[in-house]
């Protein structure tokens, strides 16, 4: 019994595979669209978060830091900094102190510049970082310290 691969068989494989992957694409798109609002933390966005994002952009923090894996890899990841540095309660105090003592001037170590931010700007930046830390990223980026 000899079987050969015919044009009809190839056509059936092509169309069957195409339909399968189109249906798979549509199912994954539907799933993403359905779960995205739950994962973005959009409901918790406040005016302070928006102002903090503006401070982030105006001072080009992404030029050195990454946020949720996006940005430069010169300085630590800040998407998980709230959990690493005091949690919700102590983070504003930590960030105020950290921003005030910059630059550290430690020989052989990368230095963060002094941005001369006001206390309100640092608080807004802290709110932005707290908000971004609550985005469900499916544990991305995978590193702990940044």
Curated annotation (Swiss-Prot):
GO cellular component: plasma membrane
Annotated transmembrane regions: 13-29
Residues that coordinate or bind heme c: 61, 64-65
Topology of this chain in the membrane: Single-pass membrane protein
Keywords annotated in UniProt: Cell membrane, Electron transport, Heme, Iron, Membrane, Metal-binding, Respiratory chain, Signal-anchor, Transmembrane, Transmembrane helix, Transport
Superkingdom classification of source: Bacteria
Segments forming a coiled coil: none
Protein localization: Cell membrane
Subunit-structure text: Heterodimer of cytochromes b (large subunit) and c (small subunit).
Name recorded for this polypeptide: Nitric oxide reductase subunit C
Organism (species): Pseudomonas aeruginosa (strain ATCC 15692 / DSM 22644 / CIP 104116 / JCM 14847 / LMG 12228 / 1C / PRS 101 / PAO1)
Primary gene name: norC
């Amino acid at each position: 019994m000899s079987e050969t691969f015919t044009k009809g068989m190839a056509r059936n494989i092509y169309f069957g595979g195409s339909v399968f992957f189109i249906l798979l694409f549509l199912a994954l798109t539907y799933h993403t669209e359905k779960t995205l609002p739950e994962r973005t933390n959009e409901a918790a966005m406040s005016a302070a978060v928006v102002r903090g994002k503006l401070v982030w952009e105006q001072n080009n923090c992404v030029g050195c830091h990454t946020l949720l894996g996006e940005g430069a890899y010169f300085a630590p990841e800040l998407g998980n900094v709230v959990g690493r540095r005091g949690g919700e309660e102590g983070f504003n105090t930590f960030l105020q102190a950290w921003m005030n003592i910059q630059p550290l001037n430690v020989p052989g170590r990368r230095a963060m510049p002094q941005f001369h931010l006001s206390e309100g700007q640092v608080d807004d930046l802290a709110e932005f970082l707290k908000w971004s830390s609550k985005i469900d990223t499916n544990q991305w980026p995978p590193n702990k310290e940044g």
